[in-house]
């Protein structure tokens, strides 16, 4: 199950459901038609549970019994499209929800009352997400929530509504419509709280925190690996110089304190400077070890 489906199925099991939610669903996934000189309303979805939920919203609010139809886009079950079909009382529904324009079409913007009332706004956003929303799987680490609208003015109104709840919502226009979206993980979690998907919000946050912890561990491991590689690279240069001294004047020709450091460096090329300092018979500071190594390198360079 995708994360989007998980959110939507949590939403339809909430006890709340009102006309603002239904208005958003109809506006974003509904269409009007004319049959036998009367209007009919079709609301489409690819989720059977959402279709039954829309059916219940209409039946409970208007004592109208819709019909659920379906057809197959392909032979794959997941491409089955469900239509909640209403052929009675459509004018009443449109008038009550303030959805009809003067040309018997659907109004493209959002009612001012929805934009000004917090509770109405929450319900509308819930319906909008159920109808045309999606969230990129948080496991991907690339966060995005978007709601598709047929009309740009609706997408812009939707962004305005989301901005009212302090979300950094933006819109982008496509050939076939417009998208309202947010891309910050914190905004997506806040949106889930606004529409009531608390369980999915907690799941999203847990996945986000786990990814961040993994990334921190990987960064630490990469830094440690880089430091080890740097240490070995530096120590190999010194080891080559020590071998040069051994092959020419002999290690025993060096002062005893340089011999001890040289022997440890050859024996443990992976040791950090601090580890070399700690391993000496009479431990010294890191700067003391560095000073002795520089002396060894200088002697080798002069040979």
Curated annotation (Swiss-Prot):
The keyword Cell cycle applies. Residues 272-303 bind DNA. Keywords: Cell cycle, Cell division, DNA-binding. GO terms for biological process: cell division; regulation of sporulation. GO terms for molecular function: DNA binding. It comes from the Bacteria. Signal peptide: none annotated. Belongs to the WhiA family. Involved in cell division and chromosome segregation. PANTHER family: CELL DIVISION PROTEIN WHIA-RELATED. This is Probable cell division protein WhiA. The gene is whiA.
